[in-house]
UniProtKB/Swiss-Prot annotation:
GO biological process, one term: chemical synaptic transmission
Protein's name in the database: Alpha-synuclein
The keyword Methyltransferase belongs to this UniProt entry's keyword annotation: no
Organism: Bos taurus
Residue ranges, annotated region (Disordered): 93-140
Annotated compartments: Cytoplasm; Membrane; Nucleus; Synapse
Sites of Phosphotyrosine modification: Y125
Post-translational modification: Phosphorylated, predominantly on serine residues. Phosphorylated on Tyr-125 upon osmotic stress.
Modified residues (Phosphoserine): S87, S129
Ranges of biased composition (kind: Basic and acidic residues): 95-105
Residues holding Cu cation: D2, H50
Amino acid sequence: MDVFMKGLSKAKEGVVAAAEKTKQGVAEAAGRTKEGVLYVGSKTKEGVVHGVTTVAEKTKEQVTNVGEAVVTGVTAVAQKTVEGAGSIAAATGFGKKDHMGKGEEGASQEGILEDMPVDPDNEAYEMPSEEGYQDYEPEA
């Protein structure tokens, strides 16, 4: 029985030693895992910050582009409105067509008001002659 007890004692010592080594190995592995996780986390954070910065910069560029497009669109609409108003004024006899809608092309818009029939007493406007009108027949 002594041999048996001695064998169990040695086995116990081996298990204790193995457990110590395992505990030490697990602690070391846990420490390295923690370092690895922290490293990956910091790199991910840097990547996220860089990614967010990049997205923010691209968004800013797109907003600028959209803003420029809106301004361009509004300018085009305003120009077409002026041209349309000029055509209407010319068709109704309130101005000369060659003076209307040429402000952006560099032609002066001076003289437009002088060509308009204006009543100084603000009582009534003189109707243009019917020579400039065409008969309108609605489509059926």
